[in-house]
Amino acid sequence: MQQETQAPPLLLLYARSISKTNYIFRVSAMDENYENFTDAYEEMWGFDANETNTFASSEVRVISLVVYCLTFLLGVPGNSFVIFIAGMKMKRTVNTIWFLNLATADLLCCLSVPLTVAEILLDHHWPYGYAMCKILPSVIVISMFASVFTLNIISLDRFTQVITPVWAQNHRSLLLARLSCVAVWILALLLSLPFMILRRTYEEFNMTVCTFDDDDFTTYGALSIVRFVFGFLIPLMSIVTCYGIIARKLGSRHFRSGRAFRIMLAVIVAFFLCWMPYHVLDLIRSYGGESSSMVALKVDPLAISLAYVNSCLNPVLYVFMGQDFKNKVQLSLRRVFERAFSEEGTQISRSTQSQQVHSVL
């Protein structure tokens, strides 16, 4: 196994300031090397080192930790229950495969939260070793890609049902859905691989940190663009285009009438709202000016925790949007999820345009 190597203090500082898992920068935790460290920092970057104490105040630290804990407490049981219902208790349909894939990606992200919280509480000392430095910080990136690609496929699935219903009726199968999910995970792993390769452990200031291995972070900046384009921009444009064409084809009233549509729209909106600050701040820190980069560093912990929140939201949305809330108190959770994931098209006649619209959406 590769041994830990020494890193220049300036590289370590900047790496820690942009690292997605080592984001809470605390100069006060440094040892006797602090004076030399701050001198080099000010000479290199032109910032007042004392100002960096505000990069992550105690309030931001506490809020982030609370958000992480809530994400874990809601996300693990919620997504586990979705997987149990969709994977074992319901008849297997294309819709249940989509929701099962989303829940798997979200659960993977939620399960990594305790390790991330422990590292934050240890003032970013990395106790998990070199191999986990490659794997653990990449979990959220893999989850992000898998989730957004699944949402994109769901949009294309809805699109084909409306625009090419004959093709969808003949080719929309469980096998194709499963193969699509496999392709989603392969693509997510491939796009996350560069982030895994660049990460390594460094021994500095009497502590071990896990961060990126790149002298000037040019490669990291390029990867930030790749992550934004393939993990946010292209999927967003594709999803908006698909649903825009569907709405134009069917009319806004019919477009909004389906239960499954309302649920999926809420899931899509929640994803992009939770992840947008993450991507925007990442680009600002990589390519923004001095003042904008410092502002981005100050609020970055909240953006990261908000991205994690998305992994616990979907089960909540399934429950509160699957049907009228006043009726939910009379149903078991299992029945609620079954209705949320149901294939409405198998229950409604297609004899009229209105009925066909409802079956698709």
UniProtKB/Swiss-Prot annotation:
Membrane topology category: Multi-pass membrane protein
GO biological process, alphabetically ordered: chemotaxis; complement receptor mediated signaling pathway; inflammatory response; phospholipase C-activating G protein-coupled receptor signaling pathway; positive regulation of cytosolic calcium ion concentration
Record bears the keyword Membrane: yes
Keywords in alphabetical order: Cell membrane, Chemotaxis, Disulfide bond, G-protein coupled receptor, Glycoprotein, Membrane, Receptor, Transducer, Transmembrane, Transmembrane helix
Compartment list: Cell membrane
Keyword Calcium: no
Chief location bin: membrane
Residue intervals passing through the bilayer: 65-85, 97-117, 135-155, 178-198, 225-245, 263-283, 302-322
Cysteine-cysteine disulfides: 133-210
Record's protein name: C3a anaphylatoxin chemotactic receptor
Native source species: Danio rerio (Zebrafish)
